[in-house]
Regions:
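Divalent metal-coordination and catalytic microenvironments
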Residues: 38, 84, 96, 146, ...
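Short acidic, flexible loop segments centered on an aromatic residue
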Residues: 98-103, 273-285
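Non-cytosolic beta-sheet module surface loops
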Residues: 76, 86-90, 136, 266-268, ...
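Bacterial N-terminal signal peptides that target proteins for export
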Residues: 2-12
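Extracellular/periplasmic metallocenter environments
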Residues: 90-94, 101-105, 111-172, 302-439
Length: 439
């Protein structure tokens, strides 16, 4: 039992060390269009339990990557004529479909052969190519994925996100061109899962004959790995584009200051339900499948809903906003005296309130520092932006005195890496004090 507790504490320590020693970013990583040259190829991804998994993926043609998981986030503007030129070096035909986009035209690619598939035109195996063109008519968060043998090819990693920014208002800070969809920071949450046994079966057949399409019984599929943006926790907390994860460039570390608005672009690219839980506050769901939740044109998201868990469904996308101020916690989160000036977005009703009282006139006091064990993300004080010296032997990695809340799948087995906790579909949101720069 003590050994298990030690391993858990050690794993949590490593996770917090990675989070707190590296910067996050508040701009979604991706490539700008409207013309994209992609390739479908094979490679390996790493999971945080130390495993290496054979996978397929889309990547930018000409890049040094053997593949990318998930595929590059494609970023375009409303009204753009979008063209995707796909080349294929996999031993199977591959295609692309774009849920939410209308009148997609598929044609022969830039040199390789293509053929008609069940759903759309496909790039032939090994040397094929195909092109897709459509007009991005509506802003929002979308996905793209293989349209060929989807039960296997999406599982293998042929999936990615598509973001269409509005043509009006402030496209970088309004998700749908309406003031009520404004945000300060945006982050992508592409949710997926894998069964490593399926990947091992495909890999073994490729080692025998890399030119022949694999055959796999997908009825035996059982997921044991869960991802956000192609990484399992705690790797979700690493910086983007770290060199030891060359095929998994995207991280997920949302950060904001009190009173600011964070936009979550959530893409469910898998096949299981993933109830995504946001500790700290409810999210406001403003759009689903790239369509703002409004009752009539021009009203904005008047049908938005508030919840503490986004009930994500396979194939759907969601846009939700998250805010945090500390209002109503029962004390002044900044530790102000009554006459001190207000912080930006601070609740005046809470200003100057002492740390919570256990009964009228008797304030709650924390145990002596020598009598407690603090987590590494705890600054030593309950006040935002403040810190106290840790006790002897205690590691403290909260650089700015921020508040940390875990965001994760509420299906508990999905926050493991092949049954090793903590891991899987999990990250942290960081409430930073004002004055701390969020890139």
């Amino acid at each position: 039992m003590n050994q298990s507790i030690y391993k858990l504490a050690k794993a949590a320590s490593v996770m917090m060390a990675m989070l707190l020693s590296l910067p996050a970013q508040a701009v979604i990583d991706g490539i700008a269009g409207p013309v994209f040259n992609l390739k479908a190829s094979a490679g390996y991804i790493s999971t945080a339990d130390g495993n290496s998994v054979y996978a397929w993926g889309f990547s930018e043609a000409g890049s040094p990557q053997t593949m990318q998981f998930p595929g590059p986030t494609l970023i375009v503007n409303q009204g753009d004529t979008v063209t995707i030129n796909l080349s294929n070096v996999l031993p199977v035909n591959v295609s692309m479909v774009f849920p939410g986009q209308s009148n997609v035209v598929a044609s022969n690619g830039l040199g390789g052969a293509s053929s008609a598939g069940l759903v759309t035109r496909e790039a032939n195996a090994l040397t094929g190519s195909v092109s897709y063109t459509f007009i991005a008519n509506a802003p929002g968060t979308y996905m793209y994925q293989s349209g060929t043998q989807q039960e296997l090819q999406v599982e293998m990693g042929l999936v990615g996100a598509l973001i269409v920014r509005p043509r009006v208002a402030d496209p970088l800070h309004q998700a749908y061109g309406h003031v009520k969809t404004a945000f300060n920071y945006e982050y992508l949450f592409l949710l997926s899962e894998m069964d490593p046994k399926i990947h091992a079966l495909v890999e073994s057949q490729m080692l025998v004959n890399p030119l022949v399409a694999p055959t796999v019984d997908m009825s035996a599929w059982v997921a044991t790995m869960w991802f956000i943006n192609g990484r399992t926790a705690p790797d979700t907390l690493l910086e983007s584009n770290v060199p030891w994860l060359p095929n998994q460039p995207y991280n997920c570390v949302p950060r904001l200051h009190p009173g600011e608005k964070l936009l979550m672009r959530v893409v469910h690219s898998g096949r299981d339900l993933h109830p995504f839980h946001t500790h700290g506050n409810n999210t406001i769901l403003i759009a689903r499948d790239g369509r703002m939740l409004e009752s009539a044109a021009g009203r904005g998201p008047d049908l938005a809903t508030s919840n503490y868990t986004i009930q994500t469904i396979p194939g759907q996308t969601y846009d939700a906003t998250f805010e945090w101020t500390g209002k109503g916690l029962g004390y002044d989160i900044y530790g102000h005296a009554p006459g001190d000036p207000l912080q930006p977005n601070e609740s005046a009703a809470d200003h100057g309130l002492p740390f919570p009282q256990i009964k009228p006139g008797v304030a709650l006091t924390l145990p002596n520092v020598l009598d407690r064990t603090d987590g590494e993300a705890y600054s030593g004080t309950p006040f935002l932006g403040q810190s106290e010296a840790p006790r002897p032997g205690q590691i403290q990695q909260n650089l700015f005195g921020g508040y940390f809340h875990m965001w994760h799948s509420h299906t508990e087995r999905e926050i493991t890496n092949d049954n090793i906790y903590p891991g899987g579909m999990m990250t942290m949101v960081v409430i930073e004090p004002h004055g701390v720069t969020i890139p």
